[in-house]
């Protein structure tokens, strides 16, 4: 999927103005996705349009009477609204307000590019709007693209966020208040599923670690008490318990605690070692 800074939605009848606007945006360093093809509707073509909207940070709609008469333009706008994209309505020609069925356009401040407006001033306003909270908007786009891919793959866990990507998503989500556009339901579900997946993976890795510690302690016990039994005194064997007992206590604690946690396993191991030490120091002399 191609990522872009701007997707321009427009009526073909407004192409001369759109070409001027596009050239100005490109000259300003913006990556613009725009469909110049005047071809009949097809599923392949519409998939390309849909993916371009999914992968853009800002959706600019060129408002005019012809825009609202175009089925394609209205369909593009519906997709942008559904994905919770940042939409910048750009007024090119005055139109009958009753022809606008979009609530999002009605609620957002427009950038005016009509014949009576100064293009340079309007363009400066447009650039400022595009650049507002740019890090947030780009994160929103990246997250949406990955969330859609995860959804299209039937929520396959191999498409989850992990490591630094998950930490970044959690950090951005924590600071979402006051940001536009807000995360949509799919994006939130994707972060939540990634968190759950990361927790499951961590538990699985910890179980493997604990099992390895358990095997180590058992091997040590076998070596000390079976292979070396004839060569060691009872006192020596008791003292050698410090070789295998910590690992055994750590492994059993880690595997049996309700939540797998290195910290909890270490605490449990410490408690066992203290109790054993007290037993050894206080009672061994009487046995």
Where are these regions (language model features)?
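Short alpha-helical packing/oligomerization segments
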Residues: 220-254
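Interfacial loop-to-transmembrane junctions
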Residues: 259-274
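Conserved N-terminal substructure of TIR/SEFIR domains
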Residues: 1-65, 81-86, 95, 117-121, ...
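Long, domain-scale regions corresponding to catalytic signaling modules most often appended to membrane systems
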Residues: 98, 116-216
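SF2 helicase/translocase ATPase core recognition
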Residues: 91-92
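Juxtamembrane boundary at the C-terminal end of a transmembrane helix
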Residues: 277-287
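Short acidic-hydrophobic, aromatic-tinged amphipathic segments that line or gate anion-handling sites
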Residues: 111-114
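Glycine-rich, charge-decorated loop segments at or immediately adjacent to ligand/cofactor-binding or catalytic sites
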Residues: 95-107
